[in-house]
From Swiss-Prot:
It comes from Cupriavidus pinatubonensis (strain JMP 134 / LMG 1197) (Cupriavidus necator (strain JMP 134)). It is a peripheral membrane protein. The active site is at 304 (proton donor). This is 3-octaprenyl-4-hydroxybenzoate carboxy-lyase. GO terms for cellular component: cytosol; plasma membrane. Homohexamer. One of its GO terms (molecular function) is 3-octaprenyl-4-hydroxybenzoate carboxy-lyase activity. It is found in: Cell membrane. Pathway: Cofactor biosynthesis; ubiquinone biosynthesis. The gene is ubiD.
Length: 509
């Protein structure tokens, strides 16, 4: 699907019956979560809540509608990435693999393809525009008040309203390009949020470099809310370091990404999507009393994609100096909870992008699956064509180290090519018949683990397990290995022809 911005995407979804409007007042405090959870589990449409309830106005409703469940099905994720189906996402993975590690052409034809790909990337370089739509309205001074936006409180035990789909734009002092990341943000005052980014994420790395290079100076940040789907999805896709997320978004969308410079002078190096619905401009301010030298606050607890409330922790405070927006802006939001939720659906879709990337590095991999029940990234199932003893273990460690997205994968199960990794029954059969626990499990201690994983003994540091559920080769066992049972193909073909009439004859005749 080709589209210009979020509004165009919404319009096309509505024409396809993939989006419904709700005019009845619905509260962003818990009610939207429950409605969207039911819609997502039923494979239902995206929803535009036109009159969010609860604002301190005579009507008791916000003037800003809420867009939710936008990526509630893999089909809509595919449409957002410029594809028509989930299967088409493999092609996007192939493009990324070619950009990540291009191979020398073996002839003029391949050279032509490589040139065409390079030209298409070059042609999608983002462009700066003047008078962007995202700056049609500007809030400054006391007008900057997050309470004027219908920010969701998703679960009963949540600490405060939470910004969920904010596209955070940062730039390190030594970086050539900006980083785009999606980090949740707890509202703590009219113009302050807690920026919850994990230590290895791009935004946190940019902030750390800034603090070292410019101690005591505010760190500039812009947050785009309601960016177009390609830009949002580009921020969570394993884009090569040599390619900007904005450029990749242009490839997905089929048109160059229009960017706007921020109005705050100290944010001059940051660019935001010109079509974004709402933009927050501000800084992480210095605090000489904090060990880091910058303002921090205690974040959480919040219900998360694990299905649990996470523990509290300290993160930087983002102070908002200015809010810009389009006329009649739309607030894009989501919730996270026990799978399935939108991150789980995104995980299933992005899984198809990962497969060609992995196969480029490890041609022996024939399929790869991140089951959504495993919180989309904590368990990986790998199907491969095994070629030698120890091969499965090599692949395990390769997957853990190849992409940053698999840094937090706790469990990897490797099976042979005769096992469907997308069928739990087959995976369990392989584990229970081909695994000796002492020989075929690998435990790795003191590895990076998701901070939200309370099962790890130390926050952010824990162990990983690999399970080799492949047939064992000489050197891996001294016993005769079992042969799988299968019917004679000729008999199967004969019975296929018999089944249609075999049970038509009445009993006893």
């Amino acid at each position: 699907m080709q589209y210009k911005d979020l509004r165009d995407f919404i319009s096309q979804l509505e024409q396809l019956g993939e989006l419904r409007r709700v005019s009845t007042p619905v509260s962003p405090n818990l009610e939207m979560t429950e409605i969207c959870d039911r819609l997502l589990r039923a494979g239902g449409p995206a929803v535009l809540f036109e009159r969010p309830a609860g604002f301190r106005s005579p009507e008791g409703t916000y003037s800003v509608p809420v867009l939710a469940n936008l990526f509630g099905t893999t089909h809509r994720v595919a449409l957002g990435m410029g594809a028509q189906s989930l299967e088409d996402l493999r092609d996007i993975g192939r493009v990324l693999s070619a950009l990540k590690e291009p191979e020398p052409p073996r002839g003029l034809r391949e050279a032509g393809k490589l040139f065409t790909l390079a030209k298409s990337v070059w042609d999608m370089a983002p462009k700066r525009v003047s008078s962007p739509a995202c700056q049609e309205i500007v809030w400054e001074g006391n007008d900057v008040d997050l309470a004027r936006l219908p920010i969701q409180t998703c679960w009963p035990g949540d600490a405060a309203p939470l910004i969920t789909w904010g596209l955070v734009v940062t730039k390190g002092p030594h970086k050539k390009r900006q980083n785009l990341g999606i980090y949740r943000q707890q509202v703590i005052s009219r113009n302050q949020v807690i920026m919850r980014w994990l230590a290895h994420r791009g935004g946190a790395l940019d902030f750390r470099e800034h603090a070292l290079a410019n101690p005591g100076k505010p760190f500039p940040i812009a947050v785009a809310l309601g960016a177009d789907p390609a830009t949002i999805l580009g921020a969570v896709t394993p884009v090569p370091d040599t390619l900007s997320e904005y450029q990749f978004a242009g490839l997905l969308r089929g048109s160059r990404t229009a960017l706007a410079g921020c109005l705050t002078p100290t944010l001059s190096e940051l660019s935001v999507p010109a079509s974004a619905e709402i933009v927050l401009e501000g800084h992480i301010q210095p605090d000489p009393d904090h060990p880091s030298g910058y303002q921090h606050a205690l974040e959480g607890p919040y219900g998360d994609h694990t299905g649990y409330y996470n523990e509290q922790d300290w993160f930087p405070v983002f102070t908002i100096d200015r809010i810009t927006m389009r006329r009649d802006p739309i607030y894009h939001s989501t919730y996270t909870g026990k799978p399935p939720d939108e991150p789980a659906v995104l995980g299933v879709a992005l899984n198809e992008v990962f497969v060609p990337l992995l196969q480029k590095q490890f041609p022996e991999i024939t399929d790869f699956y991140l089951p959504p029940e495993g919180c989309s990234y904590r368990m990986a199932l790998v199907r491969m064509k095994k070629q030698y003893a120890g091969h499965a273990k090599r692949v395990m460690f390769g997957v853990w180290s190849f992409l940053r997205q698999f840094m937090y994968t706790k469990f990897i199960v490797v099976v042979d090519d005769d096992v469907d990794v997308r069928d739990w029954k087959e995976v369990i059969w392989a584990i229970t018949t081909r695994v000796d626990p002492a020989r075929d499990t690998v435990l790795v201690e003191n590895t990076p683990i998701d901070y939200l994983d309370f099962a790890s003994p130390v926050s952010g540091l824990g162990s990983k397990m690999g399970i080799d559920a492949t047939d064992k080769w000489p050197g891996e066992t001294t016993r005769e290995w079992g042969r799988t049972i299968s019917m004679d193909p000729a008999v199967k073909a004969k019975v296929d022809g018999m089944m249609a009439t075999l049970f038509d004859r009445p009993a006893g005749t």
